[in-house]
């Protein structure tokens, strides 16, 4: 990394030097059973324990010499002038789907009254309950205020924010500022916009943009993997469509970030396998975790760029051989989540046994709960850093989902 290129990520396994996290906050306490599906959750984590688990995760990374950054801090540091701060509030409000002018005015006054920038950022993440606002006179209520009177939020919370992998993705020296699958999560990308536009270190055009949040097609960071300085992998999944991938790849090739080929993985479109990194991650030069349930239906396309056109070929044959050929290694070992046991594979994939964070070649952060997969990884010679995640996992994400590398050593 240099002052001119503050992002440097050319692999999934190079020694991790700097990483972005988000400590779960009050947005988790704004989850409630009636609206879990709307907010993309299956259960409600206990915030106090989730924070303890997340703090232990962050400390485990620091113990390995990794600098830990926080989304909420960088976003606060990006509000460098009163004008930018006010613009952020107005843009946040414009995307918050607020019902009624009087409600919007009251929320704006609430946010403008918060003096501390980090407190402001954390409030926007937490959402706004209607009970926090002054009573709106009946004469000022619109039809939507009356019809939706039982819905408790004036602005929905953003409980998925601790999965920092998805709203944007670092690729080489650039960043893909994503347009996300759901309205609930798409608001999260606003923080990345302000960081990469206004932050003293990461803003001001220092980081090339290879995708923009204003695109109409969807892509998420869990489907964007940097296999090497030459090869990317992208997932065509529940959350990422093929049209977005084509736009992303054209931009990456045009910006000359160094990549020569992309492997596009098409697999089952469902919540269980919402992103490529929930079923497939790189853990060493020649080793990957994979969920066995995707192997039968998996289709892989090689994409290159020449004469200002994408060239796409569907690959046939063995996945391990394809990966070995593209990574320049003799052979690749695909390590199956849960081993050969169908029940263990399903259970441990649901608990993110395949969603590993590699912090150096062969050194991997995992949830301790996935005992069968972990034992297999250790039998392959991998060093595991095991973290507790009984509350964190309720959001359906593991160590890779909860982290966004900003700097890795080259391999």
From Swiss-Prot:
Gene3D superfamilies in the cross-refs: Arginine deiminase (1.10.3930.10), L-arginine/glycine Amidinotransferase, Chain A (3.75.10.10)
Keywords: Arginine metabolism, Cytoplasm, Glycoprotein, Hydrolase
Membrane-spanning segments: none
Molecular function GO terms recorded: arginine deiminase activity
Localisation per UniProt entry: Cytoplasm
One BP annotation, GO: arginine catabolic process to ornithine
Source superkingdom: Bacteria
Any one GO CC term of the record: cytoplasm
Record field: catalytic activity: L-arginine + H2O = L-citrulline + NH4(+)
Pathway(s) served: Amino-acid degradation; L-arginine degradation via ADI pathway; carbamoyl phosphate from L-arginine: step 1/2
Alphabetized InterPro entries for the sequence: Arg_deiminase
Enzyme class: hydrolase
Annotated catalytic residues: 401 (amidino-cysteine intermediate)
UniProt entry tagged with the keyword Glycoprotein: yes
UniProt EC number: 3.5.3.6
UniProt key word Glycoprotein: yes
Entry similarity comment: Belongs to the arginine deiminase family.
Self-association and partners: Homodimer.
UniProt name for this protein: Arginine deiminase
Protein species of origin: Streptococcus pyogenes serotype M5 (strain Manfredo)
Biological classification of the source: Bacteria, Bacillati, Bacillota, Bacilli, Lactobacillales
């Amino acid at each position: 990394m240099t002052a001119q290129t503050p992002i440097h990520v050319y692999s999934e396994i190079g020694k991790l030097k700097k990483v972005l996290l988000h400590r779960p906050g009050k947005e988790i306490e704004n989850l409630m059973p009636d609206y879990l599906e709307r907010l993309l959750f299956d259960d409600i984590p206990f915030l106090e324990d989730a924070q303890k688990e997340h703090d232990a995760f962050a400390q485990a990374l620091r113990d390995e010499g990794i600098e830990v950054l926080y989304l909420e801090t960088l976003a606060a540091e990006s509000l460098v002038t009163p004008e930018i701060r006010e613009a952020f509030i107005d843009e946040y409000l414009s995307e918050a789907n607020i019902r009624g002018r009087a409600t919007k005015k009251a929320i704006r006054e609430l946010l403008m009254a918060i003096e501390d920038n980090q407190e402001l950022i954390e409030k926007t993440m937490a959402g706004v309950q209607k009970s926090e606002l002054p009573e709106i006179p009946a004469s000022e209520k619109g039809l939507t205020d009356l019809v939706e009177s039982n819905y408790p939020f004036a602005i929905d919370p953003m409980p998925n924010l601790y999965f920092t992998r998805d709203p944007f993705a670092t690729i080489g020296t650039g960043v893909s500022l994503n347009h996300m699958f759901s309205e609930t999560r798409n608001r999260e990308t606003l923080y990345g916009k302000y960081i990469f536009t206004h932050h003293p270190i990461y803003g001001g055009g220092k980081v090339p943009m290879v995708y923009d949040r204003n695109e109409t097609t969807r892509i998420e960071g869990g489907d964007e993997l940097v296999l090497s300085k030459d090869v990317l992998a992208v997932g065509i999944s529940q959350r990422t469509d093929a049209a977005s991938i084509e736009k992303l790849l054209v931009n990456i090739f045009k910006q000359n970030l160094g990549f020569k080929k992309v492997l596009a993985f098409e697999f089952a479109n469902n919540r269980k396998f919402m992103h490529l990194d929930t079923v497939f991650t790189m853990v060493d030069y020649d080793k990957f975790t994979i969920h066995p349930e995707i192997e039968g239906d998996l289709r892989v396309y090689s994409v290159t760029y020449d004469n200002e056109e994408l060239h796409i070929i569907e690959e046939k044959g063995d996945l391990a051989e394809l990966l070995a050929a593209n990574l320049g290694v003799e052979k690749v070992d695909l390590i199956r989540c849960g081993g050969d046991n169908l029940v263990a594979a399903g259970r441990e994939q649901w608990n993110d046994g395949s969603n590993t964070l590699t912090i150096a070649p062969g050194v991997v952060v995992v949830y301790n709960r996935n005992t069968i997969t972990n034992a297999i990884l250790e039998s392959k010679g991998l060093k595991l850093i095991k973290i507790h995640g009984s509350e964190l996992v309720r959001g359906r994400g593991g160590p890779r989902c909860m982290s966004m590398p900003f700097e890795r050593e080259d391999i």
